[in-house]
Swiss-Prot record:
Cytoplasmic face of the membrane: 102-231
Taxonomy of the source species: Eukaryota, Metazoa, Chordata, Craniata, Vertebrata
Post-translational modifications: Gla residues are produced after subsequent post-translational modifications of glutamate by a vitamin K-dependent gamma-carboxylase.
Keywords attached to this entry: Disulfide bond, Gamma-carboxyglutamic acid, Membrane, Transmembrane, Transmembrane helix
Membrane topology: Single-pass type I membrane protein
GO molecular function per UniProt: calcium ion binding; serine-type endopeptidase activity
Extracellular side: 20-78
Protein's UniProt name: Transmembrane gamma-carboxyglutamic acid protein 3
Annotated ranges, domain Gla: 20-65
Length: 231
């Protein structure tokens, strides 16, 4: 449905009502206070108008419609002087605790060897070769029978279990040297030197007189030379 009005009726509907300062409305510059009172301003808008931090903070502190509060930059710098030393002290405490823990760990490992070292020592002890123990036994008296002496002088082999599932063989025997043999060993002449052994030997006079080209002696000659051989 279209509605058409005459000019007089149309002006009565689309009429503009001017303000109280009708003539000075366009000449008078608006202030930030009036604009922020009529509307809700943000901190960035106030900062663009004043272009000064001190004036901006002064207006913002007294502004009733402030949506959020803005901290003073000087207060944040003061807080840094408190936070930084606290962080440094906390870091030093953590480093000290780590050093103490490392020292305690090293002491514990020195007193108690590791599992790998224990296995190495156990395997090394299990693969050791059997030992042959030779000791000097007591000298028996002359009145003992020869059977006991032979039993005492004969070696004894003892078998026993060992580590690693193997058997150890222990040879027990009594080794001693009589005094007579010691005296004989001390009175014997030393062996000849290398020069004496390698020196050319001189042939004796008997060997020189015997001629190997002569025929062997006969049986009668041998019997005549040794008459007591037949007896």
């Amino acid at each position: 449905m279209a509605v058409f009005l005459e000019a007089k009726d149309a002006h009565s509907v689309l009429k503009r009502f001017p303000r109280a300062n009708e003539f000075l409305e366009e000449l008078r510059q608006g202030t930030i206070e009036r604009e922020c009172m009529e509307e809700i301003c943000s901190y960035e808008e106030v900062k663009e108008v004043f272009e000064n931090k001190e004036k901006t903070m002064e207006f913002w502190k007294g502004y009733p419609n402030a949506v959020y509060s803005v901290r003073d930059p000087s207060q944040s710098s003061d807080a840094m002087y408190v936070v930084v030393p606290l962080l440094g002290v906390a870091l030093l405490i953590v480093i000290a605790l780590f050093i103490i823990w490392r020292c305690q760990l090293q002491k514990a490992t020195r007193h108690h060897p590791s599992y790998a070292q224990n296995r190495y020592l156990a395997s090394r002890a299990g693969h050791t070769l059997p030992r042959v123990m030779v000791y000097r036994g007591t000298v028996h008296s002359q009145g003992e029978p020869s059977g006991h002496r032979e039993a005492a002088n004969s070696p004894q082999v003892v078998l026993g279990p060992s580590r690693g599932g193997r058997t150890t063989v222990r040879l027990e025997s009594t080794l001693y040297l009589p005094e007579l043999s010691l005296s004989r060993l001390s009175s014997t002449t030393p062996p000849p030197s290398y020069e004496e052994v390698t020196a050319p030997q001189e042939s004796s006079s008997e060997e020189a007189s015997v001629s190997y080209s002569d025929p062997p002696p006969k049986y009668e000659e041998i019997v005549a030379a040794n008459p007591g051989a037949d007896k």
